[in-house]
Amino acid sequence: MKNKSIFGLLVNPFTRIAGWQAFGLGLVFVALMGFIGASSGIAFDGVFDMHMFEITVQQAFIYLAIDLASLVLVMWVTGLIVSKNFRFIDLLGTMTLAKAPFLLLAIMGYFTTAPNMNAIMRDPYVIFHSTSFVIMMILTLPVMVWSITLMVNALKISCGLKGSTLTVAFIVGLFVSEIIAKILIHYVV
């Protein structure tokens, strides 16, 4: 029974934490992602993606700020359209905390050696020569699924959505926020 409750909290902590508490805890994770990502060569340059390249701490935090602002503002507008009653702070807190799983990828950057980009262009199979890079690619999928699950639950709990309304609102909101983040990152950084 205890394992079920721990798993439940890992995929939906928002039944226990939301608002300012979730926002504060989420900011701790985001700050760690920024510092660790910058030093390990992991850039979170989109709402739900990351790439391996050298960045400064300042760039890391600009990327994260744009990502988070895009996600929260688009989901807020989405909430205004499809929900009758919700608090912005709950959405802000839960969406910020939903980024937490990406900290695992930032940490994994310390142990990953990315193949040279020129070598990849000549022979794409060179990526399989780096075991750590292959492990990183494999780890990325469950981390992204976990984070997206948290985002869905954040929208569900914060805005009181369910069913097809939740599904459509989330998918549209996520893709719009990713597009906005990519455009802003391209022009700002």
PLM feature spans:
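Membrane-interface helix-boundary motifs at transmembrane edges
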Residues: 14-17, 80-91, 156-164
